[in-house]
From Swiss-Prot:
This is Putative defensin-like protein 131. It comes from Arabidopsis thaliana (Mouse-ear cress). Disulfide bonds join 37-83, 46-65, 51-77, 55-79. It comes from the Eukaryota. Transmembrane segments: none annotated. It is found in: Secreted. Belongs to the DEFL family. The keyword S-adenosyl-L-methionine does not apply. Residues 1-34 form the signal peptide. Pfam families: SLR1-BP.
Protein backbone atom coordinates (compact mmCIF):
# COMPACT_ATOMS: atom_id res chain seq x y z
CA UNK A 1 0.00 0.00 0.00
CA UNK A 2 2.83 2.40 0.81
CA UNK A 3 4.45 1.60 -2.53
CA UNK A 4 1.32 2.73 -4.40
CA UNK A 5 1.20 5.98 -2.45
CA UNK A 6 4.87 6.72 -3.21
CA UNK A 7 4.36 6.00 -6.92
CA UNK A 8 1.27 8.20 -7.02
CA UNK A 9 3.12 11.11 -5.40
CA UNK A 10 6.06 10.59 -7.77
CA UNK A 11 3.86 10.58 -10.89
CA UNK A 12 1.89 13.63 -9.72
CA UNK A 13 5.14 15.52 -9.10
CA UNK A 14 6.44 14.66 -12.57
CA UNK A 15 3.10 15.63 -14.13
CA UNK A 16 3.04 19.02 -12.41
CA UNK A 17 6.68 19.72 -13.33
CA UNK A 18 5.92 19.05 -17.00
CA UNK A 19 2.80 21.25 -16.89
CA UNK A 20 4.75 24.04 -15.18
CA UNK A 21 7.43 23.88 -17.89
CA UNK A 22 4.82 24.40 -20.62
CA UNK A 23 3.22 27.29 -18.73
CA UNK A 24 6.61 29.02 -18.45
CA UNK A 25 7.37 28.36 -22.11
CA UNK A 26 4.03 29.86 -23.11
CA UNK A 27 4.71 32.97 -21.06
CA UNK A 28 8.09 33.47 -22.74
CA UNK A 29 6.62 33.07 -26.22
CA UNK A 30 3.80 35.47 -25.38
CA UNK A 31 6.30 38.09 -24.21
CA UNK A 32 8.31 38.09 -27.45
CA UNK A 33 5.47 37.61 -29.93
CA UNK A 34 4.59 40.68 -31.94
CA UNK A 35 7.68 42.66 -31.01
CA UNK A 36 9.98 44.14 -33.62
CA UNK A 37 13.68 43.31 -33.38
CA UNK A 38 16.64 44.99 -35.08
CA UNK A 39 20.15 43.91 -35.93
CA UNK A 40 23.09 45.09 -38.02
CA UNK A 41 24.76 42.90 -40.62
CA UNK A 42 28.51 43.25 -40.80
CA UNK A 43 30.15 43.99 -44.10
CA UNK A 44 32.46 46.34 -45.98
CA UNK A 45 29.70 48.24 -47.79
CA UNK A 46 25.93 48.26 -48.12
CA UNK A 47 24.05 47.60 -51.32
CA UNK A 48 20.28 48.04 -50.74
CA UNK A 49 19.32 44.98 -52.82
CA UNK A 50 21.82 42.67 -51.13
CA UNK A 51 20.98 44.06 -47.70
CA UNK A 52 17.28 43.36 -48.15
CA UNK A 53 17.94 39.85 -49.50
CA UNK A 54 20.34 38.98 -46.67
CA UNK A 55 17.89 40.16 -44.02
CA UNK A 56 15.06 38.23 -45.64
CA UNK A 57 17.15 35.06 -45.80
CA UNK A 58 18.50 35.32 -42.26
CA UNK A 59 15.43 36.53 -40.31
CA UNK A 60 12.55 36.81 -42.82
CA UNK A 61 12.71 40.57 -42.34
CA UNK A 62 13.59 43.68 -44.32
CA UNK A 63 16.88 45.48 -44.61
CA UNK A 64 17.88 49.07 -45.27
CA UNK A 65 21.20 50.81 -45.60
CA UNK A 66 21.86 53.26 -42.77
CA UNK A 67 22.46 56.17 -42.89
CA UNK A 68 20.53 56.61 -46.14
CA UNK A 69 22.51 59.68 -47.26
CA UNK A 70 26.01 58.21 -46.90
CA UNK A 71 28.18 56.64 -49.55
CA UNK A 72 27.93 52.85 -49.98
CA UNK A 73 31.27 52.39 -48.22
CA UNK A 74 30.16 54.23 -45.07
CA UNK A 75 26.70 52.69 -44.75
CA UNK A 76 25.78 49.50 -42.90
CA UNK A 77 22.89 47.06 -43.33
CA UNK A 78 20.15 47.49 -40.71
CA UNK A 79 17.65 44.62 -40.44
CA UNK A 80 14.13 44.80 -39.01
CA UNK A 81 12.24 41.57 -38.28
CA UNK A 82 9.57 40.03 -36.04
CA UNK A 83 10.96 38.50 -32.87
Amino acid sequence: MAKNRVLTIFYCTIYYCICFKYVLLGMVVEKTQGHICHDYLEGDHCDPKDCNLDCRDKWKGTGTCEPPTGTPLTRTCYCTYDC
